[in-house]
């Protein structure tokens, strides 16, 4: 899939921008304090926005919007696009294709997978040049769920990761799958259940 990078990052995330996150973590106490106030306002604005679109969200999209995945470890992010009906002998007036994305995360002792049926290409935006946080061991920072105003019946999931990248996922549907890892002892050995 093509990765597009034409938007500046503050135009992608509407509420929890990378710029605000950098200011929030500033060593300058005055900057961090101002950012803390701005962050609280962003939380309230996003909650109001989410409340305003909630009646238009199907249950599975509401479930994603209600997840709290901050600091979850990103295990895998797979994307696949396929032609829709390669064996069809009947010509169609427009290209038919389907695409899926799977985002797997570990949060505490739970593995969580978000399985998206995509409505368009996922757009990946690189970290800002001044991104000062680690680019290894990627973790989920903040996300925003929104309506895709350009495509009726579609939704957007924007995610800011700890390496500074932002993904904008246009999707038609999503499934959340969870399973718990076995409990471990202090040495990290899985405890027997039976």
What are the language-model segments listed below?
Residues 1-194:
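Surface-exposed, interaction-prone regions used to assemble/regulate multi-protein complexes
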């Amino acid at each position: 899939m093509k990765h597009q990078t034409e938007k500046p990052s503050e135009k992608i995330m509407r509420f929890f921008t990378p710029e605000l996150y950098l200011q929030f973590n500033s060593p300058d106490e005055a900057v961090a304090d101002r950012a803390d106030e701005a962050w609280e306002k962003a939380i309230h604005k996003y909650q109001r926005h989410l409340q305003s679109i909630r009646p238009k969200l199907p249950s599975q999209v509401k479930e994603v919007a209600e997840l709290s995945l901050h600091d979850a470890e990103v295990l895998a992010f797979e994307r696949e696009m396929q032609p829709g009906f390669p064996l069809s002998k009947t010509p169609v007036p427009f290209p038919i294709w389907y695409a899926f994305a799977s985002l797997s995360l570990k949060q505490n002792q739970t593995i969580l997978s978000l399985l998206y049926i995509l409505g368009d290409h996922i757009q990946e935006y690189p970290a800002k040049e001044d991104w000062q946080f680690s680019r290894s061991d990627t973790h989920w920072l903040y996300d925003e769920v929104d309506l895709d105003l350009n495509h009726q019946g579609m939704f957007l999931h924007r995610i800011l990761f700890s390496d500074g990248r932002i993904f904008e996922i246009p999707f038609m549907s999503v499934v959340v799958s969870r399973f718990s890892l076995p409990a471990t002892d202090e040495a990290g050995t899985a405890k027997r259940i039976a």
